[in-house]
Amino acid sequence: MPRLRGSGNSANLAGMSGDNFSDAVLVVLGHGTTLNAESARPVRQHCAALRQRKVFFCVSQACWKQEPHVRRVLAKLAAPRVFIVPMFISEGYFSSEIIPRELGFGEHPAREFPGTIWYYCQPVGSHDSMTGVILARAAAVVRQHPFPYAPKPADITLFVAGHGTGRNANSRKAIEHQVELIRAQNLYAGVHDIFMEESPRIADCYALAATKNIVVVPFFISDGLHAVEDIPVLLGEPERLVKERLAAGQPTWRNPTEKNGKRVWYSPAVGTEPLMADVILERVREAARKINNI
């Protein structure tokens, strides 16, 4: 594990002002993949937005599965405090076990070195403020595509679509929690979770919706394979047509599309919503407050 360079007495670093991050480096950590370089686009997007705010001394992007790799990014940093925020959709295997272990974190979410402290924050996707991100995505896709008219939320059934997997229940729990929070606001005629690999399935949205209008929001970080190809096909678009649109650089779902007697709007992934920058910042604030209170 590389040893960071820093300044000052590390014993006093944790006591700095919880909302003053002018001494700190933020590292936004994405999963990344060698199969799709665009998977890191949301990380770049939100890093750029946070740099403009000038809250941190420095904002760096990093990935686990592609360059710039998080270990190399951390090795080059020199700051009293380093906050690592996983740009992950849930508290799953990678964000909760693999990455903390490989970066040397034990049960405590902070590592102290001479002159610096690393903070490992909670993933963005499990934060309660993701409710606002989902609602922003749902409202925007209808507003941007009002044909033949923009229905009111009370005339829409909202679906939050996730992957779902029997290997880790947290993936499903994060979506179910958000559905409960949105449902409690009584904005939409109905709010449901649907999944690619668990029940209720993506295609079940047509039977579950009591309204003609449906909005589907994919609960994914990037507009990658699942969000751009798999879910449109599961919603009923021919696979050939989806691939042709993708190859031509066109949206793989036309908003709205009539399917099974319903009018369906399909939004971009939640991870590309600009409000995600606020979620990242809130995760940093929480980590700073938690350490200061220990």
State each model region's role:
Residues P2-G6:
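Short, low-complexity intrinsically disordered segments enriched in A/P/G/S/L with frequent Arg
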Residues N12-I294:
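Active-site-proximal alpha-helix that buttresses catalytic centers in soluble enzyme cores
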